[in-house]
Every structure is written in structure tokens, then in C-alpha cells.
């Protein structure tokens, strides 16, 4: 089997180590309304279209109960849209600072292109958000061949439509000749739903939730334990392979191409 293309996620996978840009904004918009949410809660829906992310947070039982305690009713669609508008406003001001390619990404992408592979991408950000991120990432040396956002299709993750549109624009078929690489549960579901080889990257991921400094200075045993939790979570949600860093991707490609794996 010949792999012809790789579809990467953005924040937490190729840029923004740890996926911190949206995290603090989600926490802030709820805190402003007297509802405290944890980092873990804020990260759980990561990878979804951002308004869907806000909606998913309001549907978490603990958060919904806390909201009802504060306001006397459960969150409404009007509440969700109000928070999302505020989320967008804040996020736009900080996005340029969270578009730095993660170490190793540019080198791996260059190597993949030398092998003749095409590079696509999907995201949970809107097109307007990605106009900012993609422009800054390109200045810093990272530019995929194709970028598809939820605005470009009928629905974002976990639906496979962004991957299908990548396939069409890249001119690659069948889908099992492509790999989806991401750092969230929704990435794994997106890739599997699209019938692609699906790979979860652990270090720098939203699922791990550590800054580069925290990962480098953490006790190695503790870090390994946290990474194993993320690895299992990826596999439980459909990952065919997991890699610690992007540098492990080419080994995955070689494994797929040398053996007759069947996507199940």
C-alpha cells in the first residue's frame, strides 16, 4: 500500500504546543458568568468547531448544574451564542501569538514532500480564525498544500467532510491511501469516520495538556504515566497508531507501506 497524503490538524499538532490559545478563553468566558470550569473540562471537546465546543461544555452535567445554580435555568442557545461571540472577540486578539510551528514539524513535512506525499489540513477553527493562524505559520515556514475549515463543509468534526474535501482538492483516492494526524479525540474520530489511517501525536497535544516547559521539566516517570493515559485514550477512540512526537510519523508510514494492514 502506498501512502499518498497526510492530513494534519493545526493547534496542538503542527502549531501551538499544548493547544493553549483557546483554553484560557473558554475558561474566562465561563468564569465571567460566575461558572468555574477546569482545564480538563475545557479541553475535553477540543478539536470541535468552536461554537460546538462551547455547546459541549454547557452540556456537561457538572457545568450545567453549576450554571443552573447561578442563573436559575440551564444554558440556552442564546447563552451559547453570546459566549461564543465573546470567545471569538478575545481569541482573534491572541491567535497571532499561537501559530508557531511545533519543533520538528517543518522538517518532517519537508521530508514527506521529498517522498512525494501531499500535505492537507483540517481544524476546529473557523476560516476567519485560520486566516490569522495560517498566515503567521507560513511566515514561520509551515504551509500545507490544502487547508479546510468547518466553514468550508456542512459540519466539522467528528464528521469526515473536511477530510473528504482535502482528498478532492489534493486529488488523492482511496481514503486508505491517506493518514490523518491529530492531537484530540475528535481528530481520531474524524480520521476513522473518513476511512483513513489515523495517528495520535502525544507530546504537545491538547489531550496531554502540558506546555513545552512543563513537559521538559516534569519528573520522567510522571510524564511517561501521563503520556500512557493519552496513548490509551487515542487508541480507545480509534487511533491505528500513536507517536510521541512528529518525528515518529515516517516510521508509521513505513510500517503501513511494508505490511498489508487492513483498516478496520
Curated annotation (Swiss-Prot):
UniProt lineage: Bacteria, Bacillati, Bacillota, Bacilli, Bacillales
Described purpose of this protein according to its UniProt entry: Involved in phosphonate degradation.
GO molecular function: magnesium ion binding; phosphoglycolate phosphatase activity; phosphonoacetaldehyde hydrolase activity
Keywords from the named record: Hydrolase, Magnesium, Metal-binding, Schiff base
TM annotation in the entry: none
Protein name per Swiss-Prot or TrEMBL: Phosphonoacetaldehyde hydrolase
GO biological process terms held by the UniProt record: DNA repair; organic phosphonate catabolic process
Pfam families: HAD_2
Catalysis: reaction(s): phosphonoacetaldehyde + H2O = acetaldehyde + phosphate + H(+)
Subunit structure: Homodimer.
Active site as annotated: 9, 50
Keyword Hydrolase: yes
UniProt keyword annotation of Iron present: no
Family recorded in the similarity comment: Belongs to the HAD-like hydrolase superfamily. PhnX family.
Binding residues annotated for Mg(2+), in chain numbering: 9, 11, 183
Organism the protein comes from: Bacillus cereus (strain AH187)
Gene coding for it: phnX
Gene Ontology terms: cellular component: cytosol
InterPro entries the record matches: HAD-like_hydrolase_sf, HAD-like_sf, HAD-SF_hydro_IA, HAD_2, HAD_sf, PGP-like_dom2, Phosphonoacetald_hydro
Domain of life: Bacteria
Cofactor note: Binds 1 Mg(2+) ion per subunit.
Amino acid at each position: 500500500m502506498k501512502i499518498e497524503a497526510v492530513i494534519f490538524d493545526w493547534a496542538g499538532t503542527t502549531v501551538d504546543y499544548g493547544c493553549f490559545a483557546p483554553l484560557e478563553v473558554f475558561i474566562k468566558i465561563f468564569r465571567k458568568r460566575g461558572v468555574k470550569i477546569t482545564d480538563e473540562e475545557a479541553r475535553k471537546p477540543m478539536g470541535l468547531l468552536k461554537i460546538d465546543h462551547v455547546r459541549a461544555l454547557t452540556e456537561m452535567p457538572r457545568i450545567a448544574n453549576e450554571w443552573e445554580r447561578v442563573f436559575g435555568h440551564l444554558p440556552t442557545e442564546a447563552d451559547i451564542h453570546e459566549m461564543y461571540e465573546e470567545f471569538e472577540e478575545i481569541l482573534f486578539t491572541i491567535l497571532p501569538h499561537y501559530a508557531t510551528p511545533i519543533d520538528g514539524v517543518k522538517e518532517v513535512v519537508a521530508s514527506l514532500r521529498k517522498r512525494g506525499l501531499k500535505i492537507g489540513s483540517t481544524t476546529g477553527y473557523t476560516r476567519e480564525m485560520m486566516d490569522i493562524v495560517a498566515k503567521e505559520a507560513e511566515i514561520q515556514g509551515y504551509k500545507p498544500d490544502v487547508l479546510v475549515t468547518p466553514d468550508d463543509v456542512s459540519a466539522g468534526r467528528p464528521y469526515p467532510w473536511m477530510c473528504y474535501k482535502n482528498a478532492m482538492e489534493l486529488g488523492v483516492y482511496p481514503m486508505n491511501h491517506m493518514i490523518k494526524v491529530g492531537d484530540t479525540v475528535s481528530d481520531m474520530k474524524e480520521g476513522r469516520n473518513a476511512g483513513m489511517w489515523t495517528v495520535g501525536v502525544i507530546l504537545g497535544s491538547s489531550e496531554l495538556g502540558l506546555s513545552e516547559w512543563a513537559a521538559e521539566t516534569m519528573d520522567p516517570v510522571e510524564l511517561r504515566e501521563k503520556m500512557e493515559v493519552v496513548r490509551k485514550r487515542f487508541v480507545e477512540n480509534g487511533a491505528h497508531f500513536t507517536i510521541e512526537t512528529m518525528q515518529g510519523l515516517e516510521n508509521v508510514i513505513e510500517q503501513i507501506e511494508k505490511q498489508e494492514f487492513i483498516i478496520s
